[in-house]
C-alpha cells in the first residue's frame, strides 16, 4: 500500500485535480504489485503456485487439459481486461513506475503500441501530465536511434510496425528495437482478423526476452474456443477481468 501511495504521488505532481484510484483500479495495481514482487524475488515459487492452481481449477471445471502448464516464458506478460472508461490509461502510468521499482530487467527500449494516431496523441498528453517521459514516433529512424530508457516511452501505432521494410513511408521494421523491450499495448488486437494475427506476431517479436503490459476492453472479440492458442495465451495473462 505504501508503494501504491508513492506511485500516486509521482503521477499527481503535475495533475489538477489529483487522481484518486477507484476500487477496481486499486485492485489492478495491487495485483500487479504482488505479481511483480513474486516474479522478481520468488519466481520458482510463483511458477509452482500457478501450476498448482491450474491443476486444481482444471479438475474442478473439467478443462480437459486445453491449457498447458505455465512455463517461465508465460510469466513475461500480464493483461488487464477492463471496460471502456475504467481508467486503463492511468494504470499504464502506474505500471511504468511499478516495473522500474522492481527492476525485472533494465529495458533497452520502452514502447507503447496503440491502434491509431489519435490514441497515440492522447496517450502522449496523459503521460506528460503524469510526468512520465515519452515521445511520439514521427516517421523517421532518427526518432528511434538512441531511444534508451532515460528517454522514456516511445509511442507508435501498430500499423507502422512491419517485419521487413519495403520502400519508403513511415513504417519501421521491428528488428530496430534490439535487446529486451518493455512493451505497453493498448487495444493492440483491433483490426481485421488477418491483420490481428500479423500484428500479434510483430508484438511477440518485440516482446521476445522482454515484458508486456497489455490492456483492452474488447478481449472478448478475439477469445474463442476456435482459436485455442490465443485463448490459452490470455487465459494465462489476464490478471484482472473488470469487463
Regions found by a protein language model. Give the residues of each.
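Conserved H-loop
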Residues: 85, 115, 217-218
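Flexible phosphate/Mg2+-sensing switch loops adjacent to catalytic phosphate-binding sites
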Residues: 39-75, 102-111, 122, 137, ...
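Inter-Walker segment of RecA-like/P-loop motor cores
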Residues: 128-167
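Conserved Walker A/P-loop ATP-binding site and its immediately adjacent core
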Residues: 90-94, 105-131
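Conserved pre-motif I regulatory segment
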Residues: 1-81
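Walker A/P-loop NTP-binding motif
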Residues: 31-36, 86-105
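Short loop/turn elements that form and flank the Walker-type P-loop nucleotide-binding site
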Residues: 35, 74, 106-107, 149-150, ...
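Signature of the SF2 helicase/ATPase Hel1-core->accessory helical subdomain module
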Residues: 92, 96-101, 125, 155-243
Amino acid at each position: 500500500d505504501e508503494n501504491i501511495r508513492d506511485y500516486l504521488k509521482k503521477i499527481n505532481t503535475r495533475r489538477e485535480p489529483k487522481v484518486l484510484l477507484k476500487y477496481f483500479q486499486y485492485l489492478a495495481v495491487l495485483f500487479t504489485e504482488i505479481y511483480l514482487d513474486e516474479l522478481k524475488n520468488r519466481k520458482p515459487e510463483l511458477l509452482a503456485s500457478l501450476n498448482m492452481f491450474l491443476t486444481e481449477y482444471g479438475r474442478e471445471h473439467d478443462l480437459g487439459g486445453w491449457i498447458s502448464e505455465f512455463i517461465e516464458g508465460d510469466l513475461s506478460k500480464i493483461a488487464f481486461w477492463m471496460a471502456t472508461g475504467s481508467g486503463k490509461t492511468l494504470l499504464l502510468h502506474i505500471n511504468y513506475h511499478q516495473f522500474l521499482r522492481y527492476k525485472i530487467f533494465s529495458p533497452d527500449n520502452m514502447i507503447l503500441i496503440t491502434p491509431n494516431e489519435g490514441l497515440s496523441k492522447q496517450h502522449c498528453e496523459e503521460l506528460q501530465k503524469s510526468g512520465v517521459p515519452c515521445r511520439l514516433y514521427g516517421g523517421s529512424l532518427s526518432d528511434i536511434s538512441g531511444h534508451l530508457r532515460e528517454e522514456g516511452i516511445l509511442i507508435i501505432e501498430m500499423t507502422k510496425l512491419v517485419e521487413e521494410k519495403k520502400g519508403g513511408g513511415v513504417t519501421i521494421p521491428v528488428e530496430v528495437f534490439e535487446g529486451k523491450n518493455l512493451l505497453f499495448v493498448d487495444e493492440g488486437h483491433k483490426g481485421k482478423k488477418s491483420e490481428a494475427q500479423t500484428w500479434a506476431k510483430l508484438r511477440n517479436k518485440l516482446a521476445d526476452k522482454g515484458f508486456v503490459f497489455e490492456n483492452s476492453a474488447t478481449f472478448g472479440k478475439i477469445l474463442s474456443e476456435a482459436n485455442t492458442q490465443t485463448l490459452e495465451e490470455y487465459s494465462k495473462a489476464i490478471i484482472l477481468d473488470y469487463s
